[in-house]
Amino acid sequence: MATPPKRGRLEGRVKKIAVEGNIAAGKSTFVNILKQADEGWEVVPEPVARWCNVQQNSEEDCEELTTSQKSGGNVLQMMYEKPERWSFTFQMYACLSRIRAQLKSIDGKLREAENPVVFFERSVYSDRYIFAANLYESDCMNETEWTIYQDWHDWMNKQFGQSLALDGIIYLRATPEKCLNRIYLRGRDEEQEIPIEYLEKLHYKHESWLQHKTLRTDFEYLQEIPILTLDVNEDFKGKKDRYDHMTEKVKEFLSTL
């Protein structure tokens, strides 16, 4: 069973928290709230823009892109339209882009903070055990692709696990029905054909992992990792009282780590 490796001086001082939850549970809104709540907090959003438009135009972004990332294409839409063809490609690319974003997360702001915290919008663990596993179980990845993905994921974590290991998880818990409604409201073109059955499968896996703790992983330390569950069925976007309440819950959670 894999365990988190020892960290460097700064990495050991920065608390790393993953914000997990179903599609459209409210993660992006939530991490934006956290970013504004404390000067010592930083967030790493999901790189959705790169999945929807792999080719980037800005010089700053292009300097950081690999050849595959400059090739162009909406790999998220391709996956939803033809999952049997593109699920493996998407999951490999999604995890790669997530790792690259999270490895860059310790910037000058965190180096100067007294109690630095970085919040990851999802983690490499939900990449594998929620989303990729669900696609494999739904016959959208074949046995060979799934085996290659797991082998690649294990190797990447051995190389970069020092910077990716978590101190805690915040689970934004919402029903599949509420998530489907939010998908329609936010209007992301690639997601408009997502069926409720897909969200139900993802919800079941999140519940098994973060509520019932019956989902087993290859990372032993995740079995005992502290988890804060926040019920987000009630819409909280634009509601300051809800922002304040959720922020206080997070501060209380961090104080226990």
UniProtKB/Swiss-Prot annotation:
<feature type="binding site">
    <location>
        <begin position="234"/>
        <end position="236"/>
    </location>
    <ligand>
        <name>ATP</name>
    </ligand>
</feature>
<feature type="binding site">
    <location>
        <position position="46"/>
    </location>
    <ligand>
        <name>substrate</name>
    </ligand>
</feature>
<comment type="subunit">
    <text>Homodimer.</text>
</comment>
<keyword id="KW-0418">Kinase</keyword>
<dbReference type="InterPro" id="IPR031314">
    <property type="entry name" value="DNK_dom"/>
</dbReference>
<dbReference type="InterPro" id="IPR050566">
    <property type="entry name" value="Deoxyribonucleoside_kinase"/>
</dbReference>
<feature type="binding site">
    <location>
        <position position="122"/>
    </location>
    <ligand>
        <name>substrate</name>
    </ligand>
</feature>
<comment type="function">
    <text>Phosphorylates the deoxyribonucleosides deoxycytidine, deoxyguanosine and deoxyadenosine. Displays highest activity against deoxycytidine followed by deoxyadenosine and then deoxyguanosine. Shows only very minor activity against deoxyuridine and deoxythymidine.</text>
</comment>
<feature type="binding site">
    <location>
        <begin position="21"/>
        <end position="29"/>
    </location>
    <ligand>
        <name>ATP</name>
    </ligand>
</feature>
<dbReference type="GO" id="GO:0004136">
    <property type="term" value="F:deoxyadenosine kinase activity"/>
</dbReference>
<dbReference type="InterPro" id="IPR027417">
    <property type="entry name" value="P-loop_NTPase"/>
</dbReference>
<keyword id="KW-0808">Transferase</keyword>
<dbReference type="GO" id="GO:0009157">
    <property type="term" value="P:deoxyribonucleoside monophosphate biosynthetic process"/>
</dbReference>
<protein>
    <recommendedName>
        <fullName>Deoxycytidine kinase</fullName>
        <ecNumber>2.7.1.74</ecNumber>
        <ecNumber>2.7.1.76</ecNumber>
        <ecNumber>2.7.1.113</ecNumber>
    </recommendedName>
</protein>
<feature type="binding site">
    <location>
        <position position="127"/>
    </location>
    <ligand>
        <name>substrate</name>
    </ligand>
</feature>
<dbReference type="InterPro" id="IPR002624">
    <property type="entry name" value="DCK/DGK"/>
</dbReference>
<feature type="active site" description="Proton acceptor">
    <location>
        <position position="121"/>
    </location>
</feature>
<dbReference type="GO" id="GO:0004138">
    <property type="term" value="F:deoxyguanosine kinase activity"/>
</dbReference>
<dbReference type="Pfam" id="PF01712">
    <property type="entry name" value="dNK"/>
</dbReference>
<keyword id="KW-0067">ATP-binding</keyword>
<feature type="binding site">
    <location>
        <begin position="182"/>
        <end position="186"/>
    </location>
    <ligand>
        <name>ATP</name>
    </ligand>
</feature>
<feature type="binding site">
    <location>
        <position position="91"/>
    </location>
    <ligand>
        <name>substrate</name>
    </ligand>
</feature>
<comment type="similarity">
    <text>Belongs to the DCK/DGK family.</text>
</comment>
<keyword id="KW-0539">Nucleus</keyword>
<feature type="binding site">
    <location>
        <position position="80"/>
    </location>
    <ligand>
        <name>substrate</name>
    </ligand>
</feature>
<keyword id="KW-0547">Nucleotide-binding</keyword>
<dbReference type="GO" id="GO:0004137">
    <property type="term" value="F:deoxycytidine kinase activity"/>
</dbReference>
<feature type="binding site">
    <location>
        <position position="191"/>
    </location>
    <ligand>
        <name>substrate</name>
    </ligand>
</feature>
<dbReference type="GO" id="GO:0005634">
    <property type="term" value="C:nucleus"/>
</dbReference>
<dbReference type="GO" id="GO:0005524">
    <property type="term" value="F:ATP binding"/>
</dbReference>
